[in-house]
Curated annotation (Swiss-Prot):
This is Putative manganese efflux pump MntP. The gene is mntP. Keywords: Cell inner membrane, Cell membrane, Ion transport, Manganese, Membrane, Transmembrane, Transmembrane helix, Transport. The lineage of its organism: Bacteria, Pseudomonadati, Pseudomonadota, Alphaproteobacteria, Hyphomicrobiales. Belongs to the MntP (TC 9.B.29) family. One of its GO terms (molecular function) is manganese ion transmembrane transporter activity. It is found in: Cell inner membrane.
Amino acid sequence: MFQIAILAFSLSTDAFAASVAKGVRFPNMSWLRSAGIALGFGTLEGLAPLIGYLLGKQFAGTIEGYDHWFAFIILAGLGLRMIWRSFHPETLSSPQMTPTWAAVLATAVGTSIDATAVGLTLALFGDNIPLTLFVIGIVTFVLTLIGLRVGGLIGERTGRWAELAGGFGLIAIGANILVTHLTA
């Protein structure tokens, strides 16, 4: 169980960081909307290893060779968009706006690509695959919800500077994924 918990927290850190950036961008997001986004992140992060496991049986070498590039491109693109918006205040959200589901989905996919790759190793957890997926999903849900709320508090106080930092944060997450895989 300890290994499952470590795996879940490790896979959830990208989702946490991305959710802080989303919270900064949309500081007045409702709890209900935050819970919906966290549920989406948790569900996708929990299912991603299963997808990786199933795909890995078919395309193990191909997926492993490119997953980090996809994650980097998605997260860097979202980060650059946030940086651009920080210099164009008219595009910043009003207090009532929330992220689009397309933006949430793109971020969730970008942060769950590593989890998909981890799915290739699910056999190491033996008969605990369903438990592993459940724990990953729950931990990601909780950390995403916390990240959205913390980001909202930061965003209310720092405005466009937080948007700029959030953009660099997403780029850093993507770059970390890329560098980690290229140097491994």
